[in-house]
């Protein structure tokens, strides 16, 4: 899927990314085992492995300056974005959540390149304020409130703040039709990934 989405990616680049990801997945599992009694969120909140690889590969290949994700939980997706940007030698991760007890698996060193924005009421106004403060965004990831109205709001607001090369990613697009409807409104064809339990979506920049 990654190679077909990014035809300019060489076989050697993809193989290198796969090797990096395998090592990082093992490190993440070790951390989770060691911290199992201190993590705030259950395992099923975590990003699934194929989706995690997609996110890591997109970040490694596109080398974004700014990534924004919504929904953090224990910090699995945050971990992969931060590790990808460390390899890239550039980039900052901004995460949006409604709670501050998130990202527990991240080390102090990883938190240096990570900014957590806790939404205040009214949440839509607070979300727009975050977007305005960090745009343009090169990668946007939705993984927060999986209701049609909120997802559509996030997608549309994020699109307005994205750079010309921006990639939009979304977890749990099988919860409702918001992602498909959003892409249809733009007359664009999304890329879908069926993982173990759910479906993730990706919308690439228009060529």
Predicted feature locations:
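A short alpha-helical cap/connector motif
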Residues: 1-141, 145-207
């Amino acid at each position: 899927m990654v190679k077909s989405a990014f035809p300019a990616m060489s076989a050697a680049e993809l193989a290198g990314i796969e090797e990096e990801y395998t090592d990082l997945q093992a490190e993440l599992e070790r951390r989770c085992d060691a911290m199992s009694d201190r993590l705030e969120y259950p395992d099923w909140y975590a990003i699934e492995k194929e989706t995690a690889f997609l996110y890591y590969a997109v970040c490694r290949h596109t080398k974004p300056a700014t990534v924004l994700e919504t929904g953090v939980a224990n910090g699995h997706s945050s971990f992969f974005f931060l590790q990808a940007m460390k390899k890239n030698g550039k980039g900052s991760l901004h995460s949006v959540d409604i709670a501050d007890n998130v990202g527990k698996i991240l080390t102090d060193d990883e938190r240096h390149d990570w900014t957590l924005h806790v939404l205040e009421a009214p949440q839509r106004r607070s979300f727009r304020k975050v977007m305005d403060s960090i745009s343009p965004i090169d990668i946007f990831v939705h993984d927060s409130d999986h209701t049609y109205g909120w997802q559509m709001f996030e997608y549309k607001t994020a699109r307005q703040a994205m750079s010309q090369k921006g990639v939009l990613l979304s977890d749990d697009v099988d919860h409702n039709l918001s992602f498909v409807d959003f892409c249809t409104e733009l007359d664009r064809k999304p890329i879908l990934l069926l993982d173990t339990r759910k479906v993730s979506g990706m919308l690439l920049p228009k060529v």
